[in-house]
Swiss-Prot record:
GO terms for molecular function: uroporphyrinogen decarboxylase activity. It comes from Staphylococcus aureus (strain USA300 / TCH1516). PANTHER family: METHYLTETRAHYDROFOLATE:HOMOCYSTEINE METHYLTRANSFERASE RELATED, UROPORPHYRINOGEN DECARBOXYLASE. Belongs to the uroporphyrinogen decarboxylase family. Its main location: cytoplasm. Substrate binds at residues 27-31, 46, 76, 152, 207, 321. Its EC number is 4.1.1.37. InterPro entries: UROD/MetE-like_sf, Uroporphyrinogen_deCO2ase_HemE, Uroporphyrinogen_deCOase. This is Uroporphyrinogen decarboxylase. It catalyses: uroporphyrinogen III + 4 H(+) = coproporphyrinogen III + 4 CO2. Keywords: Cytoplasm, Decarboxylase, Lyase, Porphyrin biosynthesis. Homodimer. PROSITE patterns: UROD_1, UROD_2.
Length: 345
């Protein structure tokens, strides 16, 4: 086990004193790193995610290179779907493609339940490898939220408008709610296994839920999110982060959920979130596109986010979405260093 562990992010969430604002980046592990690209010359994505030693190496890289205050497990949100009977393929340049999309309640009934130790042992072995031997910061495990997973399963892949997903909600509530309940059960088991293997925080990615209005979120999603988070927390007292894109209209609904940290994209400032009555620890929220700008521009955009975060008192610095491949590793290192220096208590 690691001694003198950097638990800044956990302290921030608990409301304890910290020496600086903690920082990590969504998608910090993977495609923007030259070491990862070199690895991809020899190994496929499947190889990297299914071999614990390789996956642990990729997960650990940003902590070494950028000095982040947390690591996030290098996996795909589709990981728990294949074992339950979803024929999913990750296609380069497209993303997840589902070859057996959900159309009827019979399709939902065909789905099996997940047994993480049997079905995804490589996930748990990666976590154990990181937490038992190497990592000096908390490890974030994660899952896709039921709506976001369902949208892929119904649409058959990425979508811009989620027409088929919404149509199922409106036209066939029995199938919709059966799918939601099944995905909550899967996610609870998957996340619980990650925590029991050594993950110290969980982030739920509800990437596409911003496609829904408030009324539909309350009816079709919120009860299932409450059950998912409550059941996980009922088993383990683990901090839960929730993040989605373009979902600022749902911010008060999210604040009602039993989460610990609310992730903001770049469209809503920390001050605006406070004015809307958000009481959770806030995470975010630099527009990742700014990372392609000159350093003086990046620095000027960082300051108001960090100032508002320090004024709020409960802030984890992150981007408003994931790191993309064109971002230079040196830029991420400088951002992390600037956050640590600028917010030094």
């Amino acid at each position: 086990m690691v001694h003198n562990k950097n638990n800044t992010i956990l302290k921030m969430i608990k409301g304890e004193e910290t020496s600086h604002t903690p920082v990590w980046f969504m998608r910090q592990a993977g495609r923007s790193q030259p070491e990862y690209r070199k690895l991809k010359e020899k190994y496929s994505l499947f190889d990297i995610t299914h071999q614990p030693e390789l996956c642990a190496y990729v997960t650990h890289l940003p902590v070494d290179n950028y000095h982040t205050d947390a690591a996030i497990l290098y996996k795909d949100i589709m990981t728990p779907l294949k074992p339950i009977g979803v024929d999913v393929e990750i296609k380069s340049g497209i993303g997840p493609v589902i070859h057996n999309p959900i159309k009827t309640i019979q399709d939902v009934e065909k789905l099996s339940q997940i047994d993480p130790e049997r079905d995804v042992p490589y996930v748990l072995d990666t976590i154990k490898l990181l937490t038992e031997e190497k990592l000096n910061v908390p490890l974030i495990g994660f899952t896709g939220a039921p709506f976001t997973l369902a949208s892929y399963m119904i649409e058959g892949g990425p979508s811009k408008n989620y027409n088929f997903t919404k149509a199922m909600m409106y036209r066939d509530e029995a199938t919709w709610f059966a799918l939601m309940n099944h995905l909550v059960d899967v996610s609870v088991k998957y996340v619980t296994a990650q925590v029991e293997a050594g993950a110290e925080l969980i982030q739920i990615f509800d990437s596409w839920v911003g496609a829904l209005n408030v009324e539909d979120y309350r009816r079709y999603i919120k009860p299932h999110m409450i059950r998912l988070i409550s059941e996980v927390k009922g088993k383990h007292d683990v901090p839960v982060i929730l993040f989605g894109v373009g979902a600022s209209h749902l911010i008060n609904e999210w604040n009602d959920l039993p989460i610990d940290v609310l992730g903001l994209d770049w469209r809503t400032s920390i001050n605006q979130a406070q004015q809307l009555g958000v009481t959770k620890t806030l995470q975010g929220n630099l527009d990742p596109s700014i990372l392609l700008a000159p350093w003086n521009v990046i620095e000027e955009r960082l300051k108001p986010i960090l100032d508002q975060g320090m004024e709020n008192g409960k802030h984890i610095f992150n981007l408003g979405h994931g790191v993309f491949p064109e971002v230079q590793p040196e830029t991420l290192r400088k951002v992390s260093e600037f956050v640590h220096t600028y917010t030094q208590r």
